[in-house]
């Protein structure tokens, strides 16, 4: 049976507690230590990844949308990637996904080369 409701929208109260302007800085800061997980945060019909997670998501989904953003209170531009809820649903049918909350899911990946991330990040900021 097809579920038309996005995965992260099952409990809208939870979704709003994870991805808020107050939390953006914490989420971006946590990415600095991230080497093997893609942290995705629901916005309803889309899932967003920041910085290192965004880099790894772009490798997994080469056609994902890439965005640059300035986050209030964070001194540097941030690179984000975004995929549609239905793309994530398709992926999760064949892969193990952790879901700490309905609005946050974690995909396990291989460790990446930090110099590859730095080059990708620079290119995205200068695009």
Give the role of each language-model region:
Residues 2-127:
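Basic, polar low-complexity surface loops/patches
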